[in-house]
Amino acid sequence: MINANDQVLKSINFFPEQIKDSLKESLKVNLPKEYQQIKSIVACGMGGSRFPHYIIKELFKEEIKVPYLINDDYNLPGFVDTNTLVILSSYSGTTEEVLIAGQKAYEKKAKIIGISIGGKLKEFINKINAPGYFFNPIYNPSGQPRIGFGYLIGGILGILLNLEVLNYQTEEIIFAINNIEIKKIESEAKLMAKKILNKYPYYIVSEFLTGIGNAIANQTNETAKSISSFRIIPELNHHLMEGLKNPQELKKIAIFIFFFSRLFSSSIQKRFFITQEIVEKNNIETLWYELKGQNKIEQAIGLMAFGNYLTMYLSSLYGENSATVPYVDYFKKKLKEV
């Protein structure tokens, strides 16, 4: 059972506050005037500091005015120059890939901004005299980036709004956050966790929910210590359906969870129904979860919260510690020894 005082549960319950707090504070960051002239954005981040960019990029795909590339290794694209904004995202401020990419961005004379709680990233940002949003994660007592990713969501939004590469009313975002039915979402997530226990979940998403599929798959790995994948419609319709036949053993544990929205385009909605039919024809179990909410932002925030609760309760059912990441820690330790 989940203890009501558990730090992870506290953090998850605080998720709406994480976004609201960081959105308000990041809007106050003083950005140099020349930052308004950027022609592209490259966001550097890994894991729980990466998928918030993917969420924002897909949620506001039709509104963001400049190319927005997510960079998840040590190197930068060749086009990065003085007209590029490089966002260095590292919740802890110690992510190796981000720090190295940051140095390369500086050498390329890119415009740089950091998002973090501090650490080496803050030291680097201060050294090069660049702006940054450095937050105090009071609404994330767990200390885990993937469980406090609301700070990254709000922080990224604040920066994009500040730069005017995204035009959206802050009040509308806050209204959407306040409008989600968090207790109902928690109850639904708890029920689904029981259904996917001892299964290999494939999270099926599309359009403005695409990045959240990535987030839930990530959290299933780290929080629940369970294997998972996320797949995107319509891309999966061009290959994955033919791969459902074998191996036969996989059919016993595979489960496809379709995150469906009536706000999807009509073409995508049709594909969801037909895809579910084909998956079931291959004797693979499916679950259908229809998003509620008046608009895309409300539905997206609701699904983010759902993923938080789903993976926490799944972790509890497996008897795992949802806060720790022993193999990630072991891997980092071994890297330092090489």
Predicted regions and their residues:
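Active-site phosphate/pyrophosphate-binding segments
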Residues: 4-14, 23-39, 139-142, 161-253, ...
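Short, surface-exposed amphipathic charged segments that create phosphate/polyanion-binding patches used
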Residues: 85-86, 146-155, 241-247, 301-306
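A generic structural motif
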Residues: 70-74, 226-238, 285-294
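Glycine-rich phosphate-binding loops that contact phosphosugars or nucleotide phosphates
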Residues: 35-182, 194, 260-285
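Short, small/acidic-rich helices and loops at N termini and domain boundaries
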Residues: 321-338
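C-terminal active-site/capping subdomain that shapes the small-molecule cofactor and substrate pocket
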Residues: 245-326
